[in-house]
Design a protein with these regions (language model features):
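Short recognition helix of helix-turn-helix/winged-helix DNA-binding domains
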Residues: 1-68
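Winged helix-turn-helix DNA-binding recognition segment
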Residues: 51-111
């Protein structure tokens, strides 16, 4: 476990929590978003579902575009792109582009 020391002298730890698709489905059960615009948590859950669907079709990756994700989440392209970039920084997704198409892969353990 990585330990960092804050300015006030208290230790700050980096923590990684493994979750499952079933846990995410449980957490969202009964939740209704009052607007069409998804929250970041809902968008991440959507990526989990897209990754699961891709794996069922024997694909390792989610194929699409920032525009298609923007439309699905009711976000603008800049916000969507920044969100994916942030997820990359956290190590949650890997991304590469083929032309205008984004290829995303959740960094997950399959079992």
């Amino acid at each position: 476990m990585e330990q960092k020391i804050r300015q006030n002298g208290n230790a700050e730890f980096s923590m990684t929590i493994s979750t499952s698709r079933e846990l995410w489905r449980y957490l969202f059960r009964g939740q209704k978003n009052s607007s069409e615009k998804l929250t970041r948590v809902e968008a991440f859950h959507d990526l989990i579902e897209r990754q699961y669907a891709a794996l069922q079709q024997e694909n390792d990756c989610i194929f699409g575009s920032i525009s298609s994700l923007s439309r699905a989440w009711h976000w603008d392209r800049d916000t969507t792109s920044a969100f994916i970039t942030d997820l990359e920084k956290f190590g949650a997704v890997s991304r590469y582009d083929i032309g205008k198409r984004a290829v995303l892969k959740l960094n997950c353990t399959i079992g």
